[in-house]
Amino acid sequence: MKFVLLFGVLLVTLFSYSSAEMLDDFDQADEDELLSLIEKEEARKDCIPKHHECTNNKHGCCRGHLFKYKCQCTTVVTQSGEETERCFCGTPPRHKAAELVVGFGKKIFG
């Protein structure tokens, strides 16, 4: 009888210890996930929206529905006759086609 009681106490102690470790792991995972979400939100705030100028920061465009916008540049002739480069964040044609196909597929299949 003493052996069963001792074994039961040992089993309860091990179970409570393992469940406490598991809860600590879950708490740590929640904190890590929250920090990564905060970092992603800060990165989103710093990005350049669609159709805005990205001449000075060509890799800072925001994400679209499926793809990240790309900085697209064109050469513009000013009124004084100088050629300058102007860039804006936009969706490349192949990404537009892919988004169209995906959107069409969602409408058909559900």
From Swiss-Prot:
Keyword vocabulary terms for this entry: Disulfide bond, Knottin, Secreted, Signal, Toxin
Any GO MF annotation of the entry: toxin activity
Highest taxon above the source species: Eukaryota
InterPro entries recorded: Spider_toxin_CSTX_knottin, Spider_toxin_CSTX_Knottin_CS
Subcellular localization(s) per the UniProt record: Secreted
Disulfide bonds: C47-C62, C54-C71, C61-C89, C73-C87
CC annotations in GO: extracellular region
Tissues expressing the protein: Expressed by the venom gland.
Propeptide residue span(s): 21-44
UniProt keyword Disulfide bond, yes or no: yes
Main location class: secreted
Extent of the signal sequence: 1-20
Family indicated by similarity: Belongs to the neurotoxin 19 (CSTX) family. 03 subfamily.
Comment on protein domains: The presence of a 'disulfide through disulfide knot' structurally defines this protein as a knottin.
Protein name: U1-lycotoxin-Ls1jj
Organism: Lycosa singoriensis (Wolf spider)
